[in-house]
């Protein structure tokens, strides 16, 4: 019920938001294609992925990621391409988009704006963010917020 919630409609809307957040987290930790999990994944790749996940909201360059992984940028680029089919920067963008999606689902409850979320997730250009978001999730960022706001 809505006993512990300040507003009954908020309780009704929280369920779907929390369910999708849990599914997103499970997908992210289940070792899907983005994680590149497997016995042959180089340590430098794993270190780079972890660094990106921890620091995704910060300004990052390829050199920063390579340094954290203990390899040269070209070596890291090749490892990402070979194991994930992505560049390190494309992987960073996907991690940031996943963070933004989670934040946008929560925005239905917190009232944060799309611009706030995009900026907090490391996107400098709102129109580029919106286009990338739509390409990845099939809906605009504002649609995600509305969908979870209305349940």
Question: What does each of the following model-derived ranges do?
Answer:
Residues 79, 132:
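Residues within the DNA-recognition helix of helix-turn-helix
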Residues 1-57, 61-73, 82-87, 102-127, ...:
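Alpha-helical bundle regulatory/interaction domains
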Residues 44-45, 92-97:
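Generic hydrophobic, amphipathic alpha-helix propensity
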